[in-house]
């Protein structure tokens, strides 16, 4: 989520 935050990494994508």
From Swiss-Prot:
Keywords noted in UniProt: Amidation, Neuropeptide, Secreted
Subcellular location: Secreted
Domain of life: Eukaryota
CC annotations in GO: extracellular region
GO biological process annotation, one example: neuropeptide signaling pathway
Modified residues (Phenylalanine amide): 4
Primary localisation category: secreted
Function recorded in the entry: Myoactive; cardioexcitatory substance. Pharmacological activities include augmentation, induction, and regularization of cardiac contraction.
Family membership noted in the UniProt record: Belongs to the FARP (FMRFamide related peptide) family.
Protein name per its UniProtKB record: FMRFamide
